[in-house]
Amino acid sequence: MEKIFIEIGSCDFDTLNHFANEGWSGFIIDPMKKYLNNIPRKEGVQYLPIAIDHVKGERIIHYAEDNIVGKDKDFAGMSTFIPLNERNWGFRNVEGGKIDLLSGEMLIQTDTFRNVIRDYSIERIDFLKIDTEGYDFEILKSFPWDNVLLRPKIIKVEHFHVVNGMSEITKYLEDRSYHVYAEVHDLYA
């Protein structure tokens, strides 16, 4: 039986794309077309230029512009729904205030987790990876947990940019009978 992955939040340097080399099929979901289009295409992998959200529609995303990425490659592909006044990361303190390192804004397409699963006839998920710079827990909570057959076998979710992320996400996953292992930036369940 073929294995299925879903990766929400990607870039062009740290993806699950290589799983296709081992016979997996999957979905790489990221609204930043500039980086999504740089990922080499693999048979059996769908590349969706959207963001997962609570509703289908459009939304402003904040991202690191090229001048920031040119100085610090760690910001390549970094984007978030969370505005500067609601986050404690992604800025540099300067005299008199803050410089937002995610100052670019773009209107992007959104869709729900449930819609993507329905539209692409996804019947199982072997590996779910979520890395969305602070919106990770919201996406995890939007998963259709009522469908027991879809329950991901393995989950990797970033907690680093979520306020109280490690404890809240750990409890949420444990409440769904997962065993959770924590690393500095990510949780595995």
Regions found by a protein language model. Give the residues of each.
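Phosphate/nucleotide-binding beta-alpha loop and adjacent structural elements of enzyme active sites
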Residues: 1-189
